[in-house]
């Protein structure tokens, strides 16, 4: 059986750091959230020129956040892979406490972001929303 995995390109070569940050954030969250670290791959000599990562350093770090698999790639600074708000990850929250927690952890500029959308210190965009938002939208 095939498996869908989201790969996020980190131009700043900080994918390993981001993976650990997300693991810590989700595992410390109130209510029912979970995260775990997965495998890492090391950079081969051939990737050194593109990524700027020395041979043997971490090229990819895998993690699972609330059951969803991610591969965080230390790909190097390539403009066509720059992160933007066109892709976001939705975190459905049961309580205001959860919303406030994720907003505080994942919003790099809280006063500049609104309507549940925030961008973290790594450039990844998140939507932190109440779990019942879809139902509310359908009923309006």
Regions found by a protein language model. Give the residues of each.
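A short, polar/charged loop-to-alpha-helix boundary motif
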Residues: 46, 134-140
